[in-house]
Amino acid sequence: INDDPKCHLKHFKQLPACDPLIDKCIECGFCEVNCVSNQFSLSARQRIVVQREIARLKQTGQDPARLAELEKDFLSLGEESCAGDGLCALSCPVGIDTGKYIKQLRGDHLSAKAQKTGNWVADHLSGVTTAAAVSLNVVNGIHSLVGTKALERMSTTARSLSKDRIPRWTPAMPKGASAPGETEINPDGPRKVVYFPSCIARSMGPAKNDPVQDSISAVTIRVLQKAGYGILFPAEMKKLCCGTPWESKGFAEIADRKSAELEKALLAASEQGKYPVLCDTSPCLYRMRNVMTEKLKLYEPVEFVHEFLLDHLSFTRKNVTVAIHATCSTQKLGLTGLLKKVAGMCAEKVILPPDVNCCGFAGDKGFNLPKLNEHGLRKAVSVVQQAGAVAGYSNSRTCEIGCATYTGIPYMSIMYLVDEATQPRIDKE
């Protein structure tokens, strides 16, 4: 093949040190099956390859023009289009979370103005979530006045004129919601739980045409009451957040500060871990489990229903076909099977579209980079529609918005399905 007896010692592919988070990568590509942006922009493997080339060019001083071009293009192809969900780590032989690395890069690129804005939002979260809910209600009112097609045209025009700075509107966009009060509900109940409605649940309600118009907080409280629970809430709940929105944008210090505030409030409400804590949003719960003390017994909806409510509720299957979406955090928590099991207790037929991992909504990317969301759900649409599913269920409001947008059926929290299929189980009381 070659006359050079030392050819096997030459022309090795260079793998320059780049960052400890990704330096172990052997570029095998096993991550790509779980990467939602694969074949859309860059895969997790390709992000690492580009970052290594950037590191090499910086180290050698070669080709400054190429370096500048790579750094510029990586902002959109590498950073902005990365969902940051961490599913790549599940199939990586050495557990590399490229999403974590991208979040670190986002943090490195934050301006002083962005830091100031991030801190301001964190310090005024109650007002921010209230303003978000009011804005959503205003848009919903416009929707009622002008109709779907007219509002879609208006949204498309506004988005184009703003150069995509204004989020995309679809009929699946929710109305505003509000936080429940902090007074204990059903204080004489034989069991107690601390319920923390996420900031998303406190600001985003159902869509205009969803079959149930109660908020996720109202539905969750109803299910807990049916099961005989006294419901406690953390103090000053409206200003609390797990920190996930800041973490995803690279504001690591702010994210940790908000997590610490929430942890302190949950410890007080749960009497130092005496009572379980339920959070209605899976991505929030995932972060809480990773950063908070083990004293807290933390649960997302599916796991809480399975562990605490089965003995206190009577389930009646509805004669319908429903779809479910396992969020990235549900998959990382190993709860996909449990989601299907709980849904199967409530509906005769449950559809979990194969070959769908991250939906691509990724926090706010479904609003600001909707084509990533469309790409992430491209294999789900026909499966859900051909199965004749009448509704879909998950455990993250933003993911549900994306799923509803592209499948054409309403998506809601799994707690809505549990509520519809259950009654108090009197014989167990």
Language model region names:
Residues 99-429:
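Iron-sulfur cluster-binding electron-transfer modules in prokaryotic oxidoreductases
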Residues 10-23, 67-70, 76-79, 227-231, ...:
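Short, intrinsically disordered, charge-biased short linear motifs at domain edges
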Residues 2-14, 38-74, 95-121, 409-419:
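Non-heme iron-sulfur electron-transfer modules
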Residues 6-7, 16-17, 63-64, 73-74, ...:
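A short, structure-level motif marking secondary-structure boundaries and short turns
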Residues 1-33, 39-56, 152-179:
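Flexible inter-domain linker/hinge segments
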Residues 17-20, 33-36, 73, 83-90, ...:
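Glycine- and acidic
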Residues 18-39, 74-96, 329, 356-357:
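Cysteine-centered iron-sulfur cluster-binding motifs in ferredoxin-type domains/subunits
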